[in-house]
Amino acid sequence: LALMKMSKIPPLRWLSTIYIEIIRGTPMLLQLYFFYFGLPMLIPALTKQKFLCIAIALICNSAAYVSEVIRSGIQAVDPGQKEAALSLGFSESKAMWFVVVPQAVKNILPALGNEFIMIVKDTSLGSTFFIGDLMTQYLVVKGPTYLPIEPLVIVGIIYFLMTFILSKVFGHFERKMQRADRHSGYERKRKQQREVQI
């Protein structure tokens, strides 16, 4: 979607823009209802696959936001990097995949981590459809036990642990890339100093 929106082909740009604007301009719950009831009408095989319908809705929603994160990350890369790759004989696609995208990953990693955390938390909306997510299990336990708080605290702890682990994983990769940048910058500086001495 990000590459489609940046494409020089107008129909691809239009399609991606329409998709992204529709997803970003409508509530998540509305989209869940649309996929939950609409997909089985289009694909009868999904009639009993309610969990899959909700999963597809979450993926489609997240794709719009992630594509914008990726697009902004790519556009943040110095245009001179791509121009240098093209001057070295790289094709347009190779310059994008082997020069621009690896640098863009460093720019988008924090925002991408936040988006994955949001996906985990948005799964709680699945309880509206009783698809077996954590919030649904909370409702199942709360009914016969008449304990509204204790199961809710446990569900909250589980969600916190999942998002905390995701946050730490993305933070680890971010720090690793920063160290690699500092190391490469230090090596370039050493090389320049040696050249000056020579």
Locate the predicted segments by residue.
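Transmembrane alpha-helices and adjacent helix-loop boundaries
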Residues: 1-198
